[in-house]
């Protein structure tokens, strides 16, 4: 996994440029929103001058009578300014919220599309939780950062510059004093921001790791309980949780310093204005209205620095999230298949492996499949057996084109699968994996997943073939019962449902990866009979450690260390007394 804590300033700048490029269709409307934010800030700046004018009108009228009409005119003008400023702020917030919501919608859509385009090696090197964190947490963080922080920074900057100008116009000596104090605070903020970026990156990455671990442990919580591994899980979770806590603490500590710091700076500026302003007023250099205006200007002058600091803090978090998002979006994709065939004549099911050599992309020096060759005739049931790590599942993954081979060729009916699109290859197979996959939906929806025109008669037929008919009929709504936590369903029943789904797909070839590893003996017999019917006339590849389930296979390929060391049917291999016979006998010795 990439280490984001080593991200450079250039990478963060690059991430923000990519965000701008990503939003290029909305640049115009975003510019309007930012202009409105600046206008709202500028209108606010006029307020203190008018308040000072009202103060002078009141002070001058204490002896001769207050000009209430003049006070009313200034007051109405002041109210109109504040209302207009609030209106501009509301409009820009609405615009930014709309734009960023559309951006996050598009970004999540692109991330969803990307998931189907990245090679398998990406999923092997990144946890599911980390990928999910990019799609959910990081996109939300980026959206919130752009919605709130960017306009805040622009309006605060406009307010800062406008206040500075008005302060010099009103009284340059007080402006210099305020500027000196504020400049010192600004220097401290810039220094803190430069030191805090890595902690925001740490926070996002540590959160992704925590999400990944929680997802893994939740999906395997039964194994954790059975293995009495709760204490180890708790300990490891505690370490990850502490890392998230520490990263958040450091980032929040540094960002939390900024607002109190600006409050201190602002209060010092207030004191300086009051002391030196009073001296100038007593000397007759300025009026008390100027002091009132200046006190308000100091508040408006220092508060933008805190807003800018907080906005920059949020933008740092947003840019860290953007970096993680674009790291995924710009990751390597599957090779282009526009020139490959998406159609194939009627599939018979002849499969040929010729001198296949393969190593995983992340470990090119570690060869998994060394020199695999085999001929499988149409309609044969082929069992691939061998010890763990022999290359059984890898061979099936290569057949399905989940990975590309280093050398050699794999052909179906004489056509190399490298010349066919992946979708074409996948459509040739039905597949039952070790890990059952069911989603929260009805039994019907789970069985007919991505298939159309499946009748109830077909559902009844496959369920009866798998021995599921009685189970389905006992459910409250039958096929329309929603599978959720409230519906008690065993591991064996889940396995049967996935096998029934494979039956419905009715593909010309079949892959069974440990299909009966999680069912009892009686259910295994039911499945075995159903599979015998299903595999009849279809080329079938069965991966199983329980060798008793593949005695009726037409061809058994015995693998060890990436090579096929024996081949033949059960009787031939047992008579040979080789490695297969050793594996077979060892299982029965263990059982006895």
Question: Where does each model-flagged region fall?
Answer:
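ABC-type nucleotide-binding domain
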Residues: 344-592
